[in-house]
A protein has these predicted regions:
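Conserved active-site neighborhood of enzyme catalytic/cofactor-binding cores
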Residues: 13, 20, 73, 97-102, ...
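Residue patterns forming the tRNA-binding/recognition surfaces of aminoacyl-tRNA synthetases
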Residues: 1-143, 174, 222
Length: 247
């Protein structure tokens, strides 16, 4: 439904508050919990004579790994995205030209399909563990769009924030660090490069000796999530592929 709406440029209306109750945008049942509202809608349809039938059916519902009693449901919220077209453009040629070989070769098609239909990468996760998003928000009046800076640490963020008009006297305590963590694959895709400090110290003795390696043995289910992204990182930061064969 969401993708269909995007295709036709439909307005996105979020009827839920962060706590799962209905917001003012819903118009009806405002402030009530969504689970109770579902039951109430059925009752109201029945009372209005609009309910055609009620029947049971089997559906696959995901549940939270942290709370097995909580169903996982989609919700509109702000996320961080990485533009991926550039990375797809630099990661596809090495495979199509045979610089990297897949065994069996049929998985080249899988790889190609992913990269030729690339979407931007949602890199933020609402988790308490992982690498934290390096963004710091400035104090913002209610209803105004939040301003932020991206920095290695709070001290660097403070220096950047003070360069913004109106925030020359801001303090470190007033900065709010983004609570989200990076997608686990965001650190994994850098593994061949970062293992030997290839980003901060390119051309050092270890990475010059070990990079690229010969073979990668992995599963076909993560050809895009890990294999393709490692190739992207290698091409971007080392200007060479991280391995020659993928099994």
């Amino acid at each position: 439904d969401y993708n269909l709406g995007k295709t036709h440029n439909l307005e996105t209306i979020d009827i839920f508050n962060p706590d799962g109750t209905l917001s003012q945008a819903a118009g009806l049942y405002v402030g009530q919990d969504r689970m109770e509202v579902r039951k109430q809608i059925a009752k109201d349809l029945q009372a209005a004579g609009l309910m055609e039938k009620v029947e049971n059916y089997t559906n696959k519902v995901g549940y939270s790994e942290r709370n097995p009693d909580t169903a996982v449901e989609p919700r509109l919220c702000m996320q961080w995205y990485l533009s991926m077209q550039h990375f797809a453009d630099i990661a596809l040629p090495p495979v199509l030209e045979g610089k990297i070989k897949f065994h069996p070769q049929k998985y080249v098609t899988t790889y190609r399909n992913w990269l030729e239909n690339i979407d931007d990468w949602c890199i933020s996760r609402q988790l308490w563990w992982g690498h934290r998003i390096p963004a710091y928000y400035l104090p913002t009046a209610e209803g105004k769009e939040e301003q932020f800076v991206v920095a290695m640490n709070r001290e660097e963020a403070l220096q950047k924030a003070r360069q913004i008009a109106g925030f020359e006297n801001i303090t470190a305590e007033e900065l709010r660090h983004d609570e989200d963590a990076l997608d686990t694959w965001f650190s994994s895709w850098l593994w061949p490069v970062s293992l030997f400090n290839g980003i901060l110290n390119p051309g050092n003795e270890e990475i010059s000796y070990y990079y690229p390696t010969a073979d990668l043995v992995t599963g076909p289910d993560i050809i895009f999530f890990w294999v393709a992204r490692m190739i992207m990182a290698g091409q971007e930061y080392i200007n060479d592929v991280p391995f020659r064969n993928v099994y």
